[in-house]
Amino acid sequence: MEALKKIAGVTAAQYVTDGMTIGLGTGSTAYYFVEEIGRRVKQEGLQVVGVTTSSVTSKQAEVLGIPLKSIDDIDSIDLTVDGADEVDKDFNGIKGGGAALLMEKIVATPTKEYIWVVDASKMVEHLGAFKLPVEVVQYGADRLFRVFEKAGYKPSFRMKGDSRLVTDMQNYIIDLDLGCIKDPVAFGHLLDGTVGVVEHGLFNGMVDKVIVASKDGVTVLEAPKAG
């Protein structure tokens, strides 16, 4: 599995060229993309500026010598490469297994080309077998938990040891065990309109390419262009 993740990450790095501003994703597959960019910066003199999606990725990039800028200091990003926890046939996805979904979505939004790197096990018919992360403000989180419970969403707080995990943005994550999300777009809109929800892990209609690594090789899937 790790070998497939590495292949996907290294393949994505081939899309990066001199002078780009690139979004550096978070997670076990995006890790290999960042490592390969670091190698190219050091060995090939690749000139890029990175924008990171988590404190973990920031530390990784700094160790590798990748120059970084804050999202607040840029207007657009040429290319962002990130992982995904599930991707369906309509190129909607669930992200946030690494608890970085808010920053990941903020970085993805001004990106000209958004690429996900996954192994073949992440490609699914319907989203929802992977629990859907919902980032919520700490104030009122228990009330919101009960709202989700009454709706039948089987919520659970993301934990770190014996305590609730706190994200880089100082929020909690409630994971929803939905089983199957029949209409990800509609459910995303529902969560968008829920007071106390900061962001959710449904990334609908955002990705441009999905690089899938399997035992048979690497496949690059192109999402249909809107309009």
Curated annotation (Swiss-Prot):
Catalysis performed (reactions): aldehydo-D-ribose 5-phosphate = D-ribulose 5-phosphate
A GO BP entry: pentose-phosphate shunt, non-oxidative branch
Record's keyword terms, sorted: Isomerase
GO molecular function: ribose-5-phosphate isomerase activity
EC number: 5.3.1.6
Primary enzyme class: isomerase
Positions bound to substrate: T26, G27, S28, T29, D82, G83, A84, D85, K95, G96, G97, G98, K122
Pathway linked to the protein: Carbohydrate degradation; pentose phosphate pathway; D-ribose 5-phosphate from D-ribulose 5-phosphate (non-oxidative stage): step 1/1
Gene3D superfamilies reported for this sequence: 3.30.70.260, 3.40.50.1360
Subunit structure of this chain's protein: Homodimer.
Family label: Belongs to the ribose 5-phosphate isomerase family.
Protein name, as recorded: Ribose-5-phosphate isomerase A
Annotated organism of origin: Streptococcus pyogenes serotype M18 (strain MGAS8232)
Lineage of source species: Bacteria, Bacillati, Bacillota, Bacilli, Lactobacillales
Originating gene: rpiA
